[in-house]
């Protein structure tokens, strides 16, 4: 599916080009500046030549995006939920299983579905109860009034460790995100026990193998 909250990137390759030259993210001046920066690392030049042997300019901005996208596609997130859905009924606690039922009964599953629990559709923010947002969402891309406040539904994989939440980063806690989404999207005023139950389940979607990885030599040369 498309990338970014407003769907302005059609695939991972297009997405990978954005943050690098975005002035409020990585802030590189231009694609040429990216090529020059990476071209200053001898090992990168050799690796790109090996990865793209048919290209006269192996270390190009397009190929940088292709390489990043290829890496991103290797990022899978095995979780205890996956063990449970595959037949290991002890993988989730009774509390987490109740949380799944609450998640479904509250209506969350209508948008956050599939193996990724979202990430494959757009939805209007404030579908039932209006949500105050200065960001027009997909409308900024399409200029179609029907796309006003339409955003990509995010995946809930690793949601417990990827705060802040929402397109504007305005929500700091998972509990508050659950409470607000239930109200604005499906019109449910969840009580504290229901919010806590859903939160317990969502934590079971965290990748058990999340570890910090570090490059050994490249970072010091950048």
Model segments located where?
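Periplasmic c-type cytochrome electron-transfer domains
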Residues: 1-222
């Amino acid at each position: 599916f498309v990338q970014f909250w407003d769907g302005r990137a059609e695939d991972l390759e297009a997405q990978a080009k954005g943050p690098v030259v975005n002035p409020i993210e990585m802030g590189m001046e231009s694609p040429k500046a990216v090529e020059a920066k990476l071209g200053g690392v001898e090992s990168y030049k050799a690796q790109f030549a090996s990865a793209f042997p048919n290209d006269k300019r192996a270390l190009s901005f397009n190929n940088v995006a292709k390489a990043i996208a290829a890496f991103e596609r290797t990022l899978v997130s095995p979780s205890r939920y996956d063990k449970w859905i595959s037949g290991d009924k002890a993988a989730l606690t009774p509390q987490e299983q109740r949380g799944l039922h609450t998640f479904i009964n509250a209506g969350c599953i209508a948008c956050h579905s599939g193996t990724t629990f979202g990430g494959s559709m757009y939805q209007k923010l404030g579908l039932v109860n209006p949500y105050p947002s200065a960001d027009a969402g997909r409308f900024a891309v399409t200029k179609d009034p029907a796309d006003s406040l339409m955003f990509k539904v995010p995946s809930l994989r690793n949601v417990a460790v990827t705060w802040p939440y929402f397109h504007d980063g305005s929500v700091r806690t998972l509990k508050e995100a659950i409470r607000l989404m239930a109200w604005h999207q499906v019109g449910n005023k969840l009580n504290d026990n229901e919010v806590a139950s859903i939160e317990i389940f969502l934590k079971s979607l965290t990748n058990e193998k999340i570890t910090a990885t570090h490059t050994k030599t490249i970072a010091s040369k950048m």
